[in-house]
Amino acid sequence: MRFALLNDQRVEATPGAKGVCPGCNAEMLARCGTKKVWHWAHKGRRHCDHWWENETEWHRDWKNRFVTDWQEVPARDETGELHIADIKTPYGLVIEFQHSAIKPDEVEKRTTFYGQVIWIIDGTRRPTDLIQYERMLSENYPERFDGVDIYTVYCEETRLLKEWGSLGKIVGFDFGGDNLCLLTAAQGRSRYLFDFPKVEFAKLISEGKPLPVVQFAKPVRRGYRRRRRF
């Protein structure tokens, strides 16, 4: 975790420091090595939130786009089980940053628990994901809408879309660079993707403004599209 409580203040890890978990009040130790980002770890091996994944520089870079008070916000479900949101805004929106592999049932549970949630997925974890994504776009013809190229694709076209395309929530795929590939809408088997600047994404979230979504219009006749399964 990035923060622990020390004298009732949220602080980041420093060498040799000890603190208290903001969620479960257990003792935490600062881990300040050279291979991983500096972080806090529970004195015991078990994290109080079993949904938690080890934080990477990628997680930290994303969290840094938002104010610290919105980071690592704890909440309990109806059974008293603790969960810690990566980002939770005062407007009730949760953003989860997912780097490691995750089981579909856990995604569903976390999505149901948070309700109003956006998932940001690290698209660089598997080398084949970017290859599949770029190939998919090269075999599709975008439509121009308000100056944005919108691609109509299908879940079976890439592994990432198979995993995340039917969630029914906004999903952003981060392949590095300055833009997110946003999936904000679906219609039947179709999914609609477009690039959106990360800076603008964070700005809209921080201001409590909605992200752009695809507005469905009357279908247009398209040329032949090659289809490929992965």
Language-model region placement:
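Nuclease-adjacent, charged terminal/linker segments that flank catalytic cores
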Residues: M1-Q71, D77, L211-F230
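Non-catalytic C-terminal interaction segments of nucleic acid-processing enzymes
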Residues: R2-G16, V20, T124-F230
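Active-site metal-binding core of divalent-cation-utilizing nuclease and nuclease-like domains
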Residues: E12-A13, E27-A30, D61-K109, R125, ...
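Helix N-terminus capping/helix-initiation residues
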Residues: T56, K103, D195-P197
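Short, conserved loop/helix-junction motifs that constitute active-site signature segments
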Residues: T111-Y114
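Short hydrophobic alpha-helical runs that function as membrane-insertion/retention elements
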Residues: Q116-I121
